[in-house]
Structure formats: structure tokens, C-alpha cells
């Protein structure tokens, strides 16, 4: 029997959309987007996070200004319940992906274990 792993992956993509984790994330994201302040702050947070990740990948050190900026944004985010809720839903989604990833890589882990 031939297995088309891409069909399985496409089915998984559709099933992810039906999970409570995805639906909760989708709702939380919509709520953040509806709130102008929360949306702008979350976008700023994403930009800063992306820039920091890029610097880390390039092996660059963070400047004092960048560290200060990260702390300021984190403090602001802590005061916005919509963003805190969204980030909680993101953590739940990431946990789902982590669990699924462990299942997917199990054959490789077993291969190298023996």
C-alpha cells in the first residue's frame, strides 16, 4: 500500500482548524485586532520579537536600548488582558504542535534508539 504523506499532512491541517485550541486562538486574535491599542501593542511586540530573533540567529548581542525596549513592551503587555489571553491561547496551540511533533518524530527516535 502506497502512503502519500502529503495527503495526511493536508488532512492534519484541516483537522487543526477544527481543534478547540485553534478556535480559541482565532477568537482571541480577533478580539485583539478589534481593540486599536491592543492591536498596535501586539504588532509592536511581534516586530521587536522578530528583530531580537534575527539578532540571535546572527550571533549579535542586544544593546542596552533593545533590552530596555523589551522590558517596557513586556510591562505594557502585562496590563492588557486581551493580549495576555491571546498569548495564553498561543501557548496552548504551541503545546498541541509539540505533542503532534513528538508523535511525528517517534519513528526516527525509535530508529536511533535501537
UniProtKB/Swiss-Prot annotation:
InterPro entries linked to this entry: Com_YlbF, YheA/YmcA-like_dom_sf
Gene3D superfamilies documented for this protein: YheA/YmcA-like
Stored Pfam families: Com_YlbF
SUPFAM superfamilies xref list: YheA/YmcA-like
Record-stated family: Belongs to the UPF0342 family.
Protein known as: UPF0342 protein PEPE_0673
